[in-house]
A protein has these predicted regions:
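N-terminal Rossmann-like FAD-binding beta1-loop-alpha1 element of flavoenzymes
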Residues: 52-79
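Dinucleotide-binding Rossmann-like beta1-alpha1 core, especially the glycine-rich loop
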Residues: 97-177
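Mid-domain catalytic core of redox enzymes
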Residues: 279-384, 420
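Active-site/ligand-binding neighborhood in enzyme catalytic cores
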Residues: 181-285
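Glycine-rich FAD pyrophosphate-binding loop
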Residues: 71-93
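N-terminal secretory signal peptides and thylakoid transit peptides that target proteins
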Residues: 1-13
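A short, charged/proline- and glycine-enriched loop
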Residues: 48-54, 380
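Conserved flavin/dinucleotide-binding core of flavoenzymes
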Residues: 15-43, 148, 154-157, 346-496
């Protein structure tokens, strides 16, 4: 179903007059700011110069993780963030009822190889004496799926698949177990990834080769690819498609989550490094001057010994003198919406879960911000709704997303929610929408082995790249790993 067909069908449910207007608008809308870099806008020359050993460009999780590492090593640094707040995809807000996320909203319980995540979580009290703090483990019920007009437990379809479909689910799980056993599908991915022929083909092609053609299985795999990559199986490398499943333990006790999602981690990192963070500082030029780097913002020129570039890698060619091109880097656009509800909508089937998914919907569903509350009853709540624009090319979808009116997108969100909650419009008071044109990297076929990716992962003259897009996987663990390893490289460069 394309966008036009989707609007034609779902907006039928919103043609009646509502008793009240649902307010809201676009939030964290920084496309115009970023496009100044794209369009080569001339900026005023800075009037001040300041020296610092290390400059971190970008205040998302990668940049904040680099700062966390440097702070622990007592290094001097500054973090320059273009927007008015840090966190990137791990950003959050709050109303009178609850905090709520704008994108990243959980971290799977990290396995033994995710040592950096475990170190941080021990410091934050999430991991205590080897045990996970139950306060942060997602409470039951965790997931439900809206299918055939009712909610069912879990995300694997229960009603509809035949014995043949079930056999294919079992065969696929066996393939995942075999992939996991190779040790090449790790988190962080750099610890295990090796050149693989799986990277040369799409996940859809691999499924055809394996004769896994169940439409129910295909929906589940598409959902996984959309969830982590913002792309369907046709546009995802088979290596990355398998990594979504094989990179985690088969039996997990998590995930770890908070009302504000990964914004909770952002806040904890800022408590430690916030004094070195400078927001509203657009870095528009980075050049080499003798033995130092010149990092220029409209406010001032920073002279640094080392630069950690933790902004999205596609910006390198626009900002860094002779910066590398990134033709293989594709980014998925996303829409997220926070729907404020002054009462709970009607339910059909199971009670609300933390993660609520609609079968065969363009969206990925919604999470409930108040799910972790210890109160027995909360009359109001906030639902965070996720839509990865995965039909058509990323560029086409970005243009479409940025040209839509807020009212049109608001009605689209409510229409999708109304398939399971017919009275949602009567319960909603506000819908705020965040448009993210380059929300996450797409690991397209060939990306893992691409020359552009390998060029960026190699050190270059005291400039180290640190964004999660270097992994091809836009998740917290990868962003943290890239930030910390870049910080370690920066420390070695300075001490050497």
């Amino acid at each position: 179903m394309n966008r036009r067909e989707f609007f034609g069908v779902t907006l039928l449910g919103l043609t009646r007059k509502s008793g009240r207007e649902i307010v809201g608008g676009f939030v964290h809308d920084t496309a115009a700011l970023g496009h100044r870099l794209r369009d080569g806008t001339r900026f005023p020359a800075p009037q001040r110069t300041q020296k610092v050993p290390i400059v971190i460009v970008g205040g998302g999780i990668a940049g904040l993780s680099a700062a966390w590492r440097l702070q622990k090593r007592r290094a001097e640094f500054v973090v320059l963030e273009m927007e008015d707040s840090t966190g990137g995809n791990a950003r959050a807000d709050r109303n009178d009822t609850t905090a709520f996320p704008w994108a990243a909203h959980y971290v799977p319980v990290p396995g033994p190889r995710a040592t950096l995540v475990r170190e941080l979580f021990e410091e934050l009290g999430v991991l205590e004496s080897g045990a996970w703090n139950e306060r942060y483990l997602c409470q039951a019920p965790q997931e439900r799926l809206f299918l055939h007009g009712r909610w069912q437990e879990g995300l694997e379809p229960q009603v509809g698949p035949t014995r043949r479909d079930r056999d294919q689910f079992a065969r696929f799980e066996a393939r995942v177990d075999a992939a996991r056993a190779t040790g090449q599908f790790t988190i962080p991915m750099a610890l295990g990834a090796r050149p693989s022929p799986l990277d040369a083909k799409s996940m859809a092609d691999w499924l055809r080769e394996e004769r896994l053609d169940s439409p129910w299985l295909r929906w589940s795999i598409d959902y996984g690819c959309r969830d982590d990559y913002g792309a369907r199986a046709e546009a995802t490398s088979a290596w990355a498609g398998l990594h979504y499943f094989a990179g985690r333990e088969r039996q997990e006790m998590g995930p770890l989550t908070w009302p504000e999602g990964n914004g909770w981690i952002t806040d904890r990192l800022l408590e430690r490094v916030g004094g070195a963070v400078r927001t509203r500082q657009m870095v528009y030029r980075i050049t080499r001057k003798g033995r130092q780097w010149s990092v220029v913002t409209p406010d001032r020129e920073w002279q640094a010994d080392v630069v950690i570039f933790a902004a999205p890698s596609f910006l390198a060619s626009r900002v860094i003198e002779n910066g590398p091109a990134t033709p293989d880097f594709e980014y998925s656009p996303w829409l997220t919406a926070n729907v404020w509800l002054d009462r709970w909508p009607q339910e059909r089937g199971l009670p609300p879960a933390w993660d609520n998914v609609f079968f065969d919907s363009p969206s990925l569903g919604y999470v409930v911000a108040t799910h972790q509350s210890l109160r027995t009853f909360i009359p109001r709540t906030v639902w965070t709704y996720y839509w990865a624009l995965d039909r058509g090319t990323p560029r086409e979808n970005r243009i479409w997303l940025l040209t839509q009116r807020w009212q049109t997108l608001r009605d689209r969100v409510l229409a999708d929610l109304s398939r399971a909650h017919p009275d949602v419009r009567d319960c909603a008071t506000r819908v705020d929408i965040c448009r993210m044109g380059h929300a996450m990297i797409r690991p397209t076929p060939g990306f893992l082995t691409s020359a552009a990716r390998h060029q960026l992962t190699a050190a270059r003259d005291r400039l180290f790249y640190a964004h999660s897009d270097l992994s091809g996987i836009s998740i917290f663990e990868e962003a943290q790993y890239r930030g910390v390893t870049a910080a370690d490289a920066a420390l070695r460069a300075i001490s050497g």
